[in-house]
UniProtKB/Swiss-Prot annotation:
Pfam families: IFN-gamma (PF00714)
GO BP term (any one): defense response to virus
Lineage, highest ranks first: Eukaryota, Metazoa, Chordata, Craniata, Vertebrata
Name this protein carries in UniProt: Interferon gamma
GO cellular component: extracellular space
Source organism per UniProt: Marmota monax (Woodchuck)
Length: 166
């Protein structure tokens, strides 16, 4: 995996140590530059509805929204990776990636690396499929709210204890 393009853009965020290394005006300008490059302000872009906004509007609870946002952020990182050789929009993409990194990953390089690692797992590889199925139960248990999991473990322990005493 190539992290160099991400790491270079994000090192400034880490060095500055701020929650956001770019002013919102700078990020907005770079987004407008990308819109211009892709002609994304054209009226036909909205044909068929929004790509992500309607989905985001459905989810109000922060934990639910984070799940959807992680998929959307993954899409943008894949888009920027696909366009990485385009010198015309490189600065805009680097600025936006840096801001996404600061906001979504709280400037944590480890979180970013794990996120990229998970998003780049190949599902058509048999070895990967076998590992994924092997880990499925633990992943499913990790999805449970921790208080429910503890209650279940406690009740299973007390049931086992009663059976042993009979």
């Amino acid at each position: 995996m190539k992290y160099t393009s991400y790491i270079l853009a994000f090192q400034l965020c880490i060095i500055l140590g701020s929650s956001s290394c770019y002013s919102q005006d700078t990020v907005n300008k770079e987004i407008e530059d990308l819109k211009g490059y892709f002609n994304a302000s054209n009226s036909n872009v909205s044909d068929g509805g929004s790509l992500f906004l309607d989905i985001l509007d459905k989810w109000k609870e922060e934990s639910d929204k984070k799940v959807i946002q992680s998929q959307i952020v993954s899409f943008y990182f894949k888009l920027f990776e696909h366009l990485k050789d385009n010198k015309i929009i490189q600065r805009s993409m680097d600025t936006i990636k840096g801001d996404l990194f600061a906001k979504f990953f709280n400037s944590s390089t480890n979180k970013l690396q794990d996120f990229l690692k998970v998003s780049q797992v190949q599902v058509n590889d048999l070895k990967i499929q076998r590992k994924a199925v092997s880990e499925l139960k633990k992943v499913m248990n990790d999805l449970l709210p921790h208080s429910t999991l503890r209650k279940r473990k406690r009740s299973q322990s007390s049931i086992r204890g009663r059976r042993a005493s009979k």
